[in-house]
Amino acid sequence: MSRVGKKPVVVPSGVTASVQGQIVTMKGPKGQLQFIVHDDVEVQFENGSVTVKPRVETNRARALYGTARAQVANLLEGVTKGFEKKLDITGVGYRAALQGKKLQLALGYSHDVVYDIPDGITITVPKPTEIFISGNDSQRVGQVAAEIRSYRPPEPYKGKGVRYSDEFIFRKEGKKK
C-alpha cells in the first residue's frame, strides 16, 4: 500500500499557499494554480506545510487522499519550476514550425496540421524535428503533448511519427517473402 498521502507538502519561501474549504491555491514565481480537492479528503495548511488526510476511513477516501497529496505537490512544483515535455518528430519530410500562436506540423498528410496553442502553454521549436512544451500546470502540459502526438503516433515498422523523447518504440520486423 502506498503511503504518499501521509507526507506533508512543505511550502518553501517565495511561494504562498492558501486553503479555503476544498480549494488549494498556490502562488509562486511561475504564476498561480488552484486545485479543488474531493469532498472525502480534508486539507490543512499550518506551519508552512500542507497536509492531506481522509475525512472518513473508507477505501475510496484512502485512495483519493494520496492522489490529492500528489496533486498539491504538482501545484507546488508548477509554481516554482514548471513542467516541460519534449517531443521528437521522426520521418522523411516530417517537421514542425511556429507561426505566432499556432504550431504548424507537416506529418505526411496532404495538408499541414495546424494546432492552436492554448493559454498558459509555451511551445518552442529549436529544430524542425523537436518540440518543447512547457507550462506551470502538469495536466495541461501533458494533455497538449498527447494531442500533438495523436496527430501521427509512432508506427512500429519504421518508427515514423511524433513521440515523446523518452518513449521507447517497440519495433517490428516486416513480413518476409
Swiss-Prot record:
This is Large ribosomal subunit protein uL6. GO terms for biological process: cytoplasmic translation. This protein binds to the 23S rRNA, and is important in its secondary structure. It is located near the subunit interface in the base of the L7/L12 stalk, and near the tRNA binding site of the peptidyltransferase center. Keywords: Ribonucleoprotein, Ribosomal protein, RNA-binding, rRNA-binding. The lineage of its organism: Bacteria, Pseudomonadati, Pseudomonadota, Alphaproteobacteria, Hyphomicrobiales. Disulfide bonds: none annotated. The gene is rplF. It comes from the Bacteria. HAMAP family: Ribosomal_uL6_B. The keyword Transmembrane helix does not apply. Gene3D superfamilies: Ribosomal protein L6, alpha-beta domain. GO terms for cellular component: cytosolic large ribosomal subunit. Belongs to the universal ribosomal protein uL6 family. Part of the 50S ribosomal subunit. GO terms for molecular function: rRNA binding; structural constituent of ribosome. InterPro entries: Ribosomal_uL6-like, Ribosomal_uL6-like_a/b-dom_sf, Ribosomal_uL6_a/b-dom, Ribosomal_uL6_bac-type, Ribosomal_uL6_CS.
